[in-house]
Amino acid sequence: MALSFFSGGGSASYAKYFDIRLDEGYIVFRGGEQEAASAQLSGKLLLCLSEPLAAKHVRLNLTGISRVCWHLPSGSASGSRKSWREKVFYEKTWTFRDAGKSKTEVLAAGNYEFPFHVILEGSMPESVEGLSDTYVTYRFKAEIGRKYAKDIVVRKPLRIIRTLESSALELSHAMSVENIWPNKIEYSISTPTKAVIFGTSLRVDFKLIPLLKGLKIGQIVSQLIESHDLTLNPEDPDSIRNTYKSTRTIVSDEYELDDEGSLEIIDEEAEGYQFSRYLDLPKTLTRCLQDTDTRGIKIRHKLKFRVQLLNPDGHISELRATLPVSIFISPNLAIDENNNLVDQTPQTARRAVDDIAQQAPPLYGEHQFDQLYSEVDPSGYRTPGPGSGPGTPFGALSRNISSENLASMNALTSTDLSVSALQTRLSNLHASRFSNPSPTEIDNHADSEQRRLGISTADYFGPSSGSNSHSPASPELSRRPSDEGYRDHDHIPSGMATPFHPQYAEVETLSRVPSYSTAMRSTVRPCDSELPDYQAVVAEDTAMPALQSPQQAYIRSAGRGTSMNTGIDVHQLRSGHFSSRTSNSHDEEDRRLRLVQARARV
């Protein structure tokens, strides 16, 4: 409320303009009181003086007040009995000028701007306005104190809106009630979402399938009911609270079906009625409040339905159902100081619904007061946890997931991972590339290791393998993933060299990747020193042997009545079963002669 001039005597006419101007028209909290982030309130106090003004102080005060009140009818002639309680729960004062006790300060003519700002906690109560004697309000009061004249005062309300987050379940979950009344009707009544924006419309979908021949649907009544639960002392225990409950009807809709035009096939099975009804919500808070529960004021909404069933024998039955709904205020629909929507056109309401459905993530500026990551306790967010075993085997390659190795898994927690063990594995892997042991050497080495570890070398399917290979008494079947366990962990069963608490600092050191400049300065080592480089291969004058198709010889026996085919396949020739691949010309002619003689005898 801006003052352009002041009536009365004295120097009151010197203040030509005095107003409170906010950077934002209202404060928005997204989420409940326990989860909403803080918000910044900022603005300016503007003062325009045409002549000097003597003032004791210039102050701005923000006050939050809650009031709960109700009237109970009384039998006396005085009328009703009133119960009420008012409390100031928030107060903030900015002092821009203060001359001191019993002193004044002369403000020269000109324009003055006094900026102010404050951080409002997300747990602060939201504004509740619309009831006559019950409310939660925030009001600014700017004051210029004067010594020998009336103080100059201007007031401005502040509205705090608590709305739903875009990820709230109320915005995505449909509410429905469906059931079957035996030998009467099958019904389903639903709403697309539980949450509804204040000032928009509420859609209700009906599906009614009569199960009794000759049953007709009568009048269908839909009502939006608002319940008030007021408490004078909400901080006290439930047993001693002074409460008052009341309800009122916000919207009522009556509808009758057209039996001939509305009947249709539903779900390709039964005939019934399927339709939708729209309930337009009021555009003012005096007729409909938002859902809230703060400062002893609890507001809730629900839909009530009554469906008349006209039975063939003439009597009337009634189907009753209820659905909970939640009404919230959208920041996209502005509300004026008289608690009415500023823009009440259907296009604006449709736009607000679409904005909620396609809401983008909040801007960066709306999260400048969120909790920092450094303030979050990281316990429980890092993996692996203290109780997680890092040595889980591959199911296709290990039998450690079966029951016979449960006992051996206990040894998993008794070892530790060291850098030397990793280096040993790498060196063994590198050394194995240069050595090609014969199969006999490998078998002898495996037999010696099995004898040292006490593992039987009998056939797995032989008699000595036991009747059941999955017996819990065979933990020795676990496999060792690497070779250093033979030397470093001789006392641990096979496969039990995986640590429980690895030394992550040493592992990170080994897995550190050098920078690009460091890699460019280092020399490139060949993967295998015995392999020739590219220049050596190009310099050699190698003659590629001519490729020949596979051959197979068939030799018949000397007898006419019997024959025997002896086939020699290419795989055997290439595997070294014959010492020579070619023969001289004499051997070739001799072989051809024998073939001709054999054919002549046949």
From Swiss-Prot:
Which residue stretches does the UniProt record annotate as biased composition, category Basic and acidic residues? 477-492
Compositional bias (Low complexity) spans? 463-475
Q: What SUPFAM superfamilies is this protein classified in?
A: E set domains (SSF81296)
In this chain, the stretch annotated as Disordered covers: 375-398, 457-499
Among the GO biological process terms of this entry, one is: regulation of protein ubiquitination
Q: Cite a GO CC annotation.
A: plasma membrane
| Keywords assigned | Ubl conjugation pathway
Any one Pfam family here would be: Arrestin_C
The record ties this protein, via Gene3D superfamilies, to: 2.60.40.640
Q: Which GO terms describe its molecular function?
A: protein-macromolecule adaptor activity; ubiquitin protein ligase binding
Q: Which InterPro entries match?
A: Arrestin-like_C, Arrestin-like_N, Arrestin_C-like, Arrestin_domain-protein, Ig_E-set
The subunit field of the Swiss-Prot or TrEMBL record says: Interacts with hulA.
Function noted in UniProt: Component of the regulatory network controlling carbon source utilization through ubiquitination and deubiquitination involving creA, creB, creC, creD and acrB. May be involved in signaling by recognizing appropriately phosphorylated substrates via its arrestin domains and then recruit a HECT-type ubiquitin ligase such as hulA, leading to ubiquitination of the substrate, providing a link between ubiquitination and phosphorylation in protein regulation and stability.
The UniProt similarity line reads: Belongs to the arrestin family.
Cross-referenced PANTHER family, in alphabetical order? ARRESTIN DOMAIN CONTAINING PROTEIN, FI21816P1
Name under which the protein is recorded: Probable HECT-type ubiquitin ligase-interacting protein creD
User: What species does this protein belong to?
Assistant: Aspergillus clavatus (strain ATCC 1007 / CBS 513.65 / DSM 816 / NCTC 3887 / NRRL 1 / QM 1276 / 107)
